[in-house]
A protein has these predicted regions:
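C-terminal boundary and immediately downstream tail of ABC-type ATPase nucleotide-binding domains
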Residues: 138-161, 188
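Short, structured beta-strand/loop micro-motifs enriched in basic residues and often containing a Trp
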Residues: 239-242
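Short aromatic-glycine-enriched beta-strand elements
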Residues: 222-227
């Protein structure tokens, strides 16, 4: 924003050299101020507004001339966490009201998942995957996408059957895959998909059930991020996200030996890439 111009003048800047009359420009500015929820802020200067309000004014200025395409280049990166979460919701609602095709560049995966209708994941200038947020997160097409969007525990494995993979001496059940038997692959699972079963092995348990030592717990508000060490997977620590309720219910604590389940439908295989 231009610091020496009022909010009204900032929004009107792109309209002043058009064929619109002064009354039409004033009406458009008033309409946009109402749209972004700042109807009484027109006479103020940018320095008198919060960072979040300034971003909304900048967006109003960008759409004042009625563009057919809008490019937002990391518009929320300079804001604090709470304002960022609030504004991404506001921008999405505003974009839907306007119906303007919008491309938003971001390095914030959570921002992309929450705001986008479709996501393009790029790596060194090349497109890795295009899809809905759900497709990109739940059905990543490459190891880069799987690792970049959200957290992943990664293992080196060998395909041992149509729905089987071997990691060291341990065989895991998984969904059917496209790889031939004996193929070396990278195996991944998301932390939130790992199920804690407790200190004792339940009488009824599914496939892919193992014991592991809980070596680290990090409290992240609504869940605990845990690091687990298992003899079944000597290569790497397993990262698991357990809900606060699950930790309380199962009395989970650091250094405990815990039984966990890796659901077969949550295990994904990709072309092997060295870490």
């Amino acid at each position: 924003l231009f610091p020496n111009l009022t909010i009204e003048k900032n929004i009107a800047f792109g309209l002043e050299n058009t064929e619109r009359s002064k009354n039409e420009i004033n009406e458009r500015v008033s309409e946009l101020l109402d749209l972004i929820g700042l109807p009484d802020q027109g006479p103020k200067y940018p320095a008198q507004l919060s960072g979040g309000q300034q971003q909304r004014i900048a967006l109003a200025r960008a759409i004042a001339s009625g563009p057919g395409l809008l490019l937002l280049d990391e518009p929320l990166s300079a804001l604090d966490a709470k304002v960022r979460v609030y504004l991404r919701h506001e921008i999405k609602i505003l974009q839907q009201k306007l119906g303007v095709t919008t491309i938003m560049v971001t390095h914030d995966q959570e921002e992309a998942l929450s705001m986008a209708d479709r996501i393009v994941v790029m790596n060194e200038g090349k497109v890795e995957q295009i899809g809905t947020p759900n497709e990109v997160y739940c059905k990543p097409e490459t190891l880069f996408v799987a690792d970049f969007i959200g957290e992943m525990t990664q293992f080196r494995g060998t395909i041992s059957g149509k729905s089987l993979v071997k990691i060291g001496n341990t065989e895991l059940n998984m969904v059917e895959h496209r790889f031939s038997q004996g193929r070396e692959v990278s195996i991944t699972i998301r932390p939130e998909d790992i199920i804690p079963l407790g200190a004792k092995l339940p009488a009824k348990s599914g496939k892919n059930v193992f014991s592991a030592q809980l070596v680290e717990m990090e409290f992240l508000g609504s869940f605990w991020r845990c690091k687990l060490k298992s003899d079944e997977f000597p290569e790497a620590l397993v990262t698991a996200d357990f809900s606060v309720n699950a930790v309380r219910r199962l009395s989970i604590e650091t250094n405990q030996i815990l039984w966990i389940e890796l659901p077969s439908e949550s295990i994904l295989a990709f072309d092997f890439q060295a870490a």
